[in-house]
Amino acid sequence: MIPSSKPNSRVELRFRCHHLKNLDIVSKSDPQIFISEKRGPGGFQFVDCTEKIKNNLSPEFKKTITLDYYFEEIQTLTFTVMDIDKEITLFGDLDKNDKIGEFTTSLSNILSRPGRKIVADLIHHSKVTGKIEISAEEICQTNHHIFLSAEGIGLDKKDLFSSDPYYKIYKTNPNGEQLLVFQSIVIKSNVNPLWPELHMELEKFNGGDMFRELLIEVYDYDSIGAHDLIGITRTTTDAILRGVIEYPLINPKKTSKSGYKNSGILKFYKVRLEKTHTFLEFLAGGCEISLMTAIDCTGSNGSVNSFSGLHYNDLEKGGSAYARSIASVGSVLSSYDSDGFIDVFGFGGEYQGRTSHCFPFSLDPNVPSAFGVAGVLEMYNRNISKIPFSGPTNFASVIQEAIARASESRLPYQQKYTVLLIITDGEICDMDETIKCLVQASNLPLSVVIVGVGLSSFENMNLLDGDNGCLVDYKGNRAKRDIVQFVPFNKYSGNINALAQETLKEIPGQLLSYFKSIGVPPNPPRTFIPVDILPPPPQ
């Protein structure tokens, strides 16, 4: 699968600074903020800049910066505040001597803060040189879906006794071009057809323009040759929503005939708009995303001390494939979890003298979690050599553990979503039980991400990834939604950022599908609680 290039949202950043260090002698500094983003091995690249504000040490900038937001990426941003005495044309032309200070953080860190606002120190030469205040706002698209049902009344009979009608809806471009946005099914032998409900994103329906002209054509379907036009009509989304629901269908070829009125009526009913909530709205309302990690400790991984072993701590590569997977996925998700604790389990190894398919990786039943990604990696590196490897490779127990934890937070006002990261080297041996657990889990606020390390074919893993259809367990129960994403580590081992992108790209959609399925909207946005911003002490 190719990593998604479609952003989850577009966000707008606004800036203020407070109590900047003055670099000018006669007057005050002329601050301007330059934004750069870390992009791959090439390091930071310039994105955009604010305007320059003259003679002001606590400026509020008018120009906003718009960025695409990707949940699955760590979008590291650096905000550099410069004292600009002369106009520059290139980012590289900046004089380092004119730097007031800079601040580096991730876009996710800003977006997950209460009020989507952060106030931080500007640092230069290890000294605080002022404060920067960054506010983020999602650029609102329509975020709505349109629903409508259509009915034909008294349509012309194009066949011997009846017609086989269907309809098309086109939106009209400013240049007059008609773009097809919807085509209904064919209703056989019926001049008073009732078509199934139309449901689609408002942007796709009318481009977000409620007054854009819509052309509607009704045809009689013919299995051989061209379909026969019954009639056309024109309207707008606004008119339909205001209750103009019956439209005469006109056939241009018949308008010159004496006594011609129309070729039937097209009627719309049950027309409504429904707001589509965004991933960022759930974040703003305090929805937490917690990470649970399960590490494969089966014998097929090889010896921890062998260079060919998958748990071998290869320092030249940044650790084992397991450690790199944890660092890649965990570093993205950790920004969205307020308490910072990550549950860590092992499976397929010996625990307390017998093979266990779900045991605390700390080896202490009273300590199921570690703090932050660094804590998980420390626990992993400390204990992996202490665990006797065994087998087989069973997933059901760790999924059941995740189900139990996801079931703890199902109150609407305590919105929490769990991501279970399973890192494994082999094929599943309890496929039926695993599918049964995943079908059960599809009703819960839970996603399962599987990273396959090593050289196995992972055929069963691809079956679990519901991209090719819903999972069905051995009892015939169908998964309510797709919650599994499988990624082979070797495909992205040379690019850890790409691994995180591919691994996590479906999480926002899966979270939204869960809360939509239970009819729960985002909580109201949390309020940013301001703190007194005091000038730095005299140096």
From Swiss-Prot:
Protein's name in the database: Copine-C
SUPFAM superfamilies: C2 domain (Calcium/lipid-binding domain, CaLB), vWA-like
Residue ranges of every copy of the VWFA domain listed in the record: 290-507
Keyword vocabulary terms for this entry: Calcium, Metal-binding, Repeat
Family stated for the protein in its record: Belongs to the copine family.
SMART domains in UniProt: C2, VWA
Source organism: Dictyostelium discoideum
GO MF terms, alphabetically ordered: calcium-dependent phospholipid binding; metal ion binding; phosphatidylinositol-4-phosphate binding
CDD domains membership: C2A_Copine, C2B_Copine
Binding positions (Ca(2+) 2): 23-24, 83, 85, 98
PROSITE patterns: C2
Xref: Pfam families: C2, Copine
